[in-house]
């Protein structure tokens, strides 16, 4: 019985951690030129918003800063303050955009989709960049 508890506790460890892998190398390896350009733009925007250099979290998330969290369950870990991942179908932004106070901004953003805490954008040309900058800044402020 104790063996199972140990395994379960270890399994609850956060799998996405900051790495020392090269962010510029990761972005340079994005096969789609437009997505690569969008990723470079997001790096600049998020770096300006946080004042932090980008780090690769896990194999495919570019994150800025670090935020320590503790859930009511006792599980805790670290995550980037804001982050994005240039996935094949869309850019995924982890900026707390789906918080209820951001609804009016999302209505002005342009073409996008949302998931649980994520913002999906096919290409930056589809959105209002000023609104996106505001959403990123709000995501940073939320974890300050």
Task: For each feature predicted by the language model, list its residue ranges.
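Charge-dense, helix-prone N-terminal extensions
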Residues: 1-144
């Amino acid at each position: 019985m104790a063996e199972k508890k140990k395994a379960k506790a270890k399994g609850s460890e956060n799998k996405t951690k900051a790495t020392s892998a090269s962010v510029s190398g990761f972005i340079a390896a994005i096969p789609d030129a437009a997505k690569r350009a969008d990723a470079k733009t997001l790096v600049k925007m998020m770096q300006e918003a946080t004042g932090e250099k980008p780090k690769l979290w896990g194999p495919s998330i570019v994150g800025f800063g670090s935020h320590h969290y503790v859930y009511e369950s006792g599980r805790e870990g670290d995550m980037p303050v804001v982050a994005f991942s240039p996935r094949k179908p869309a850019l995924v932004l982890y900026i707390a955009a789906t918080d209820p106070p951001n609804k009016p901004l999302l209505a002005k953003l342009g073409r996008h989709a949302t998931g649980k805490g994520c913002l999906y954008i096919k290409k930056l040309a589809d959105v209002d960049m000023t609104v996106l900058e505001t959403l990123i800044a709000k995501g940073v402020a939320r974890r300050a």
